[in-house]
Amino acid sequence: MANIVSRTDAEAIIREQVVSTIFQDAPKQSVFMSMAKKLPNMTSNQTRIRVLDFLPTAYWVNGDTGMKQTSRQAWDNVYLNAAELAVIVPISEAVLSDAEFDIFGEITPRVNEAIGQRVDAAIIFGNNRPAEWPNDIITMARQAGNNVAVSGTPDYYNLLLGENGVISKIEDDGYMATGALAAMGMRAKLRGIRTTEGIPLFKSDMQGSTQYSLDGAPLHFPQNGAFDANVAQLIVGDFSQAVYAIRQDVTVKILDQGVIQDPVTKEIVYNLAQQDMVALRIVFRMGWALPNPATRMDEDRVGCAFAYLEPTTPATTQTVTST
Protein backbone atom coordinates (compact mmCIF):
# COMPACT_ATOMS: atom_id res chain seq x y z
CA MET A 1 0.00 0.00 0.00
CA ALA A 2 1.38 3.41 -0.98
CA ASN A 3 2.11 5.88 1.81
CA ILE A 4 1.28 9.60 1.88
CA VAL A 5 1.95 12.48 4.23
CA SER A 6 -1.59 13.43 5.14
CA ARG A 7 -2.87 16.70 6.57
CA THR A 8 -3.15 14.97 9.94
CA ASP A 9 0.54 14.04 9.81
CA ALA A 10 1.59 17.61 8.98
CA GLU A 11 -0.91 19.44 11.15
CA ALA A 12 1.75 20.45 13.69
CA ILE A 13 3.74 22.35 11.05
CA ILE A 14 0.87 23.96 9.18
CA ARG A 15 0.44 27.59 10.20
CA GLU A 16 -3.08 28.95 10.19
CA GLN A 17 -3.63 32.47 8.92
CA VAL A 18 -4.44 34.97 11.68
CA VAL A 19 -6.17 38.18 10.68
CA SER A 20 -4.25 41.12 12.11
CA THR A 21 -7.36 42.98 13.26
CA ILE A 22 -9.95 42.44 15.96
CA PHE A 23 -13.45 41.96 14.60
CA GLN A 24 -15.74 44.24 16.59
CA ASP A 25 -18.37 46.92 16.10
CA ALA A 26 -17.55 50.60 16.46
CA PRO A 27 -17.97 51.95 20.00
CA LYS A 28 -21.26 53.78 20.52
CA GLN A 29 -21.48 57.19 22.17
CA SER A 30 -24.09 58.82 24.41
CA VAL A 31 -27.21 59.72 22.45
CA PHE A 32 -28.43 62.17 25.09
CA MET A 33 -25.19 64.15 25.08
CA SER A 34 -25.32 64.42 21.30
CA MET A 35 -28.86 65.87 21.35
CA ALA A 36 -29.10 67.94 24.55
CA LYS A 37 -27.67 71.44 25.07
CA LYS A 38 -24.13 71.53 26.40
CA LEU A 39 -23.34 74.27 28.90
CA PRO A 40 -19.83 75.56 29.69
CA ASN A 41 -17.76 73.17 31.76
CA MET A 42 -18.45 73.21 35.49
CA THR A 43 -15.85 74.88 37.71
CA SER A 44 -17.05 73.14 40.88
CA ASN A 45 -19.25 70.21 41.79
CA GLN A 46 -22.39 72.37 41.51
CA THR A 47 -23.52 74.87 38.89
CA ARG A 48 -26.48 77.21 39.33
CA ILE A 49 -28.54 78.41 36.40
CA ARG A 50 -31.33 81.00 36.57
CA VAL A 51 -34.72 80.01 35.27
CA LEU A 52 -37.76 82.16 34.57
CA ASP A 53 -40.31 81.18 37.21
CA PHE A 54 -43.16 83.71 36.92
CA LEU A 55 -44.30 85.76 33.94
CA PRO A 56 -45.68 89.30 34.09
CA THR A 57 -49.04 90.12 32.58
CA ALA A 58 -50.72 93.24 31.20
CA TYR A 59 -54.20 94.67 31.76
CA TRP A 60 -56.62 96.76 29.76
CA VAL A 61 -57.32 100.17 31.27
CA ASN A 62 -60.99 100.97 31.86
CA GLY A 63 -61.76 104.39 30.34
CA ASP A 64 -59.75 107.60 30.35
CA THR A 65 -59.10 107.67 34.08
CA GLY A 66 -58.96 103.96 34.87
CA MET A 67 -56.38 102.66 37.31
CA LYS A 68 -53.45 100.76 35.87
CA GLN A 69 -52.72 97.43 37.54
CA THR A 70 -49.36 96.05 38.58
CA SER A 71 -47.62 92.80 37.78
CA ARG A 72 -44.36 91.07 38.60
CA GLN A 73 -41.77 88.71 37.21
CA ALA A 74 -39.77 86.14 39.17
CA TRP A 75 -36.85 83.79 38.69
CA ASP A 76 -35.83 80.50 40.22
CA ASN A 77 -32.59 78.57 40.64
CA VAL A 78 -31.91 75.19 39.08
CA TYR A 79 -28.76 73.32 40.04
CA LEU A 80 -26.55 70.94 38.11
CA ASN A 81 -24.78 68.58 40.49
CA ALA A 82 -21.78 66.67 39.23
CA ALA A 83 -21.83 62.90 39.60
CA GLU A 84 -18.85 60.67 38.96
CA LEU A 85 -18.50 57.64 36.71
CA ALA A 86 -15.30 55.67 37.13
CA VAL A 87 -13.74 52.28 36.59
CA ILE A 88 -10.40 50.59 37.24
CA VAL A 89 -9.16 47.88 34.88
CA PRO A 90 -6.22 45.91 36.38
CA ILE A 91 -3.95 43.88 34.15
CA SER A 92 -0.71 41.95 34.52
CA GLU A 93 2.43 43.59 33.14
CA ALA A 94 3.40 40.25 31.62
CA VAL A 95 0.12 40.09 29.73
CA LEU A 96 0.67 43.63 28.46
CA SER A 97 4.14 42.72 27.29
CA ASP A 98 3.08 39.51 25.54
CA ALA A 99 -0.08 40.82 23.87
CA GLU A 100 -0.05 41.32 20.12
CA PHE A 101 -2.33 44.36 20.39
CA ASP A 102 -2.26 47.55 22.44
CA ILE A 103 -4.54 46.38 25.23
CA PHE A 104 -5.02 49.83 26.75
CA GLY A 105 -5.81 51.17 23.29
CA GLU A 106 -8.49 48.52 22.93
CA ILE A 107 -9.97 49.02 26.40
CA THR A 108 -10.23 52.82 26.48
CA PRO A 109 -12.82 53.22 23.65
CA ARG A 110 -14.99 50.52 25.21
CA VAL A 111 -14.90 52.23 28.59
CA ASN A 112 -15.93 55.47 26.88
CA GLU A 113 -18.81 53.53 25.33
CA ALA A 114 -19.79 52.21 28.77
CA ILE A 115 -19.78 55.77 30.12
CA GLY A 116 -22.16 56.87 27.38
CA GLN A 117 -24.43 53.91 28.10
CA ARG A 118 -24.55 54.70 31.82
CA VAL A 119 -25.24 58.39 31.16
CA ASP A 120 -28.13 57.64 28.81
CA ALA A 121 -29.64 54.97 31.06
CA ALA A 122 -29.52 57.20 34.15
CA ILE A 123 -30.78 60.42 32.54
CA ILE A 124 -33.48 58.93 30.34
CA PHE A 125 -34.69 55.94 32.36
CA GLY A 126 -33.31 56.50 35.86
CA ASN A 127 -31.35 53.24 35.84
CA ASN A 128 -28.66 53.49 38.55
CA ARG A 129 -29.36 57.22 38.76
CA PRO A 130 -26.94 59.06 41.08
CA ALA A 131 -28.58 60.52 44.18
CA GLU A 132 -27.26 63.97 43.26
CA TRP A 133 -29.21 64.04 40.01
CA PRO A 134 -32.85 65.03 39.42
CA ASN A 135 -35.52 62.58 38.34
CA ASP A 136 -35.06 60.98 34.95
CA ILE A 137 -36.84 62.09 31.79
CA ILE A 138 -39.32 59.20 31.83
CA THR A 139 -40.35 59.97 35.41
CA MET A 140 -40.79 63.70 34.75
CA ALA A 141 -42.79 63.01 31.60
CA ARG A 142 -45.06 60.60 33.46
CA GLN A 143 -45.58 63.07 36.32
CA ALA A 144 -46.66 65.64 33.72
CA GLY A 145 -49.13 63.19 32.18
CA ASN A 146 -47.08 62.89 29.00
CA ASN A 147 -47.21 59.11 28.71
CA VAL A 148 -49.32 57.48 26.00
CA ALA A 149 -50.73 54.00 26.59
CA VAL A 150 -50.95 51.41 23.82
CA SER A 151 -54.19 49.54 23.21
CA GLY A 152 -54.58 45.90 22.24
CA THR A 153 -54.68 46.71 18.52
CA PRO A 154 -52.48 49.80 18.30
CA ASP A 155 -52.77 52.43 15.59
CA TYR A 156 -49.22 53.71 15.66
CA TYR A 157 -49.93 56.64 13.38
CA ASN A 158 -52.41 58.10 15.86
CA LEU A 159 -50.30 57.09 18.85
CA LEU A 160 -47.40 59.09 17.46
CA LEU A 161 -48.86 61.89 15.35
CA GLY A 162 -52.57 62.07 16.14
CA GLU A 163 -54.54 63.88 18.83
CA ASN A 164 -53.35 62.83 22.29
CA GLY A 165 -50.34 61.19 20.64
CA VAL A 166 -46.84 61.61 22.01
CA ILE A 167 -46.05 64.66 19.90
CA SER A 168 -49.29 66.41 20.81
CA LYS A 169 -48.47 65.88 24.50
CA ILE A 170 -45.42 68.12 24.36
CA GLU A 171 -47.12 70.54 21.98
CA ASP A 172 -49.89 71.03 24.55
CA ASP A 173 -47.17 72.06 27.01
CA GLY A 174 -45.78 74.60 24.55
CA TYR A 175 -42.83 72.70 23.09
CA MET A 176 -41.90 71.57 19.60
CA ALA A 177 -40.21 68.23 19.06
CA THR A 178 -36.55 68.45 18.05
CA GLY A 179 -35.75 64.75 18.25
CA ALA A 180 -36.96 61.30 19.18
CA LEU A 181 -35.47 58.06 20.48
CA ALA A 182 -36.93 54.62 19.96
CA ALA A 183 -36.21 50.98 20.57
CA MET A 184 -34.91 49.04 17.59
CA GLY A 185 -38.20 47.13 17.44
CA MET A 186 -40.00 50.37 16.57
CA ARG A 187 -38.42 50.37 13.12
CA ALA A 188 -40.57 47.43 12.03
CA LYS A 189 -43.69 49.05 13.47
CA LEU A 190 -43.00 52.26 11.54
CA ARG A 191 -42.37 50.38 8.32
CA GLY A 192 -45.76 48.76 8.79
CA ILE A 193 -47.70 52.05 8.97
CA ARG A 194 -49.63 52.43 5.71
CA THR A 195 -52.17 54.71 4.12
CA THR A 196 -55.71 53.55 3.42
CA GLU A 197 -54.42 52.60 -0.04
CA GLY A 198 -51.76 50.37 1.51
CA ILE A 199 -48.80 52.64 0.73
CA PRO A 200 -46.09 52.67 3.44
CA LEU A 201 -45.63 56.08 5.06
CA PHE A 202 -42.07 55.61 6.28
CA LYS A 203 -40.75 53.57 3.37
CA SER A 204 -40.76 54.70 -0.25
CA ASP A 205 -39.07 51.63 -1.72
CA MET A 206 -37.55 48.30 -0.72
CA GLN A 207 -33.98 49.14 -1.77
CA GLY A 208 -33.11 52.57 -0.39
CA SER A 209 -32.27 53.36 3.22
CA THR A 210 -34.97 55.05 5.29
CA GLN A 211 -34.45 58.37 7.05
CA TYR A 212 -36.80 58.10 10.00
CA SER A 213 -38.35 61.27 11.43
CA LEU A 214 -41.52 62.32 13.23
CA ASP A 215 -43.09 65.58 12.09
CA GLY A 216 -39.66 66.77 10.99
CA ALA A 217 -37.86 65.69 14.18
CA PRO A 218 -35.08 63.16 13.49
CA LEU A 219 -35.70 59.75 15.00
CA HIS A 220 -32.73 57.86 16.44
CA PHE A 221 -32.44 54.22 17.43
CA PRO A 222 -29.76 53.99 20.16
CA GLN A 223 -27.45 51.00 19.89
CA ASN A 224 -25.42 51.49 23.06
CA GLY A 225 -27.67 49.25 25.15
CA ALA A 226 -29.17 52.08 27.22
CA PHE A 227 -32.69 52.16 25.76
CA ASP A 228 -35.08 50.19 27.98
CA ALA A 229 -37.84 48.83 25.76
CA ASN A 230 -39.64 47.51 28.84
CA VAL A 231 -40.33 51.09 29.93
CA ALA A 232 -40.89 52.94 26.65
CA GLN A 233 -41.13 52.18 22.96
CA LEU A 234 -40.40 55.73 21.90
CA ILE A 235 -39.46 59.05 23.51
CA VAL A 236 -39.96 62.39 21.82
CA GLY A 237 -39.14 65.85 23.07
CA ASP A 238 -37.50 69.23 22.78
CA PHE A 239 -33.95 68.19 23.57
CA SER A 240 -32.79 71.81 23.62
CA GLN A 241 -34.59 72.13 26.97
CA ALA A 242 -32.31 69.51 28.55
CA VAL A 243 -28.90 70.82 29.56
CA TYR A 244 -25.72 69.20 30.80
CA ALA A 245 -22.25 70.31 31.81
CA ILE A 246 -19.02 68.42 32.27
CA ARG A 247 -17.05 68.82 35.48
CA GLN A 248 -14.24 66.47 34.50
CA ASP A 249 -13.92 65.09 31.02
CA VAL A 250 -12.82 61.51 30.53
CA THR A 251 -9.49 61.25 32.35
CA VAL A 252 -7.23 58.24 31.92
CA LYS A 253 -4.46 57.40 34.39
CA ILE A 254 -2.21 54.35 34.52
CA LEU A 255 -1.53 53.18 38.08
CA ASP A 256 1.47 51.00 38.95
CA GLN A 257 1.48 51.40 42.73
CA GLY A 258 -1.10 50.80 45.43
CA VAL A 259 -3.72 48.18 46.16
CA ILE A 260 -7.19 47.50 44.79
CA GLN A 261 -9.94 46.61 47.26
CA ASP A 262 -13.22 44.82 46.79
CA PRO A 263 -15.94 47.54 46.97
CA VAL A 264 -18.18 45.30 49.09
CA THR A 265 -15.89 43.40 51.46
CA LYS A 266 -13.06 46.00 51.47
CA GLU A 267 -10.60 43.13 51.16
CA ILE A 268 -7.44 43.70 49.14
CA VAL A 269 -7.84 42.01 45.77
CA TYR A 270 -4.66 43.10 44.02
CA ASN A 271 -1.38 44.61 45.13
CA LEU A 272 -0.07 46.24 41.97
CA ALA A 273 3.58 46.55 42.99
CA GLN A 274 3.83 43.14 44.61
CA GLN A 275 2.08 41.32 41.76
CA ASP A 276 3.74 43.19 38.86
CA MET A 277 0.45 44.69 37.69
CA VAL A 278 -0.79 47.99 36.36
CA ALA A 279 -4.32 49.38 36.33
CA LEU A 280 -6.12 51.69 33.95
CA ARG A 281 -8.24 54.19 35.90
CA ILE A 282 -10.84 56.19 33.98
CA VAL A 283 -12.92 58.95 35.58
CA PHE A 284 -15.75 61.13 34.19
CA ARG A 285 -17.90 63.70 36.01
CA MET A 286 -20.95 65.57 34.74
CA GLY A 287 -24.29 67.03 35.77
CA TRP A 288 -27.56 67.66 33.97
CA ALA A 289 -30.96 69.29 34.47
CA LEU A 290 -34.30 69.94 32.81
CA PRO A 291 -34.90 73.56 33.93
CA ASN A 292 -38.51 73.74 32.65
CA PRO A 293 -38.88 77.55 32.60
CA ALA A 294 -42.25 79.24 32.72
CA THR A 295 -43.77 79.86 29.30
CA ARG A 296 -47.01 81.43 28.11
CA MET A 297 -48.39 77.95 27.49
CA ASP A 298 -47.11 76.54 30.79
CA GLU A 299 -46.93 79.41 33.26
CA ASP A 300 -47.11 77.11 36.29
CA ARG A 301 -44.14 75.00 35.12
CA VAL A 302 -46.09 71.75 35.50
CA GLY A 303 -45.57 70.56 31.92
CA CYS A 304 -42.66 68.67 30.44
CA ALA A 305 -40.70 68.97 27.21
CA PHE A 306 -40.75 65.18 26.77
CA ALA A 307 -43.35 62.48 26.20
CA TYR A 308 -43.12 58.76 25.67
CA LEU A 309 -45.03 55.84 24.22
CA GLU A 310 -45.52 53.01 26.66
CA PRO A 311 -44.75 49.43 25.67
CA THR A 312 -47.60 47.07 24.85
CA THR A 313 -47.27 45.73 28.39
CA PRO A 314 -46.29 48.79 30.44
CA ALA A 315 -43.91 48.49 33.36
CA THR A 316 -45.76 48.41 36.68
CA THR A 317 -42.85 48.52 39.12
CA GLN A 318 -41.04 51.83 38.91
CA THR A 319 -39.31 53.68 41.71
CA VAL A 320 -40.08 57.41 41.66
CA THR A 321 -38.50 60.10 43.81
CA SER A 322 -40.38 63.41 43.89
CA THR A 323 -38.30 66.53 44.35
Describe each model-derived feature in a short phrase.
Residues 2-87:
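Assembly/oligomerization interface modules of large self-assembling protein complexes
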Residues 43, 140-278, 284, 318-322:
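Extended oligomerization regions of viral-like shell subunits
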Residues 50-53, 92, 183-185, 222, ...:
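Structured loops at beta-to-helix junctions and adjacent beta-edge loops in soluble globular domains
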Residues 55-58, 86, 95, 117, ...:
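Short loop/turn segments at secondary-structure transitions that flank enzyme active sites
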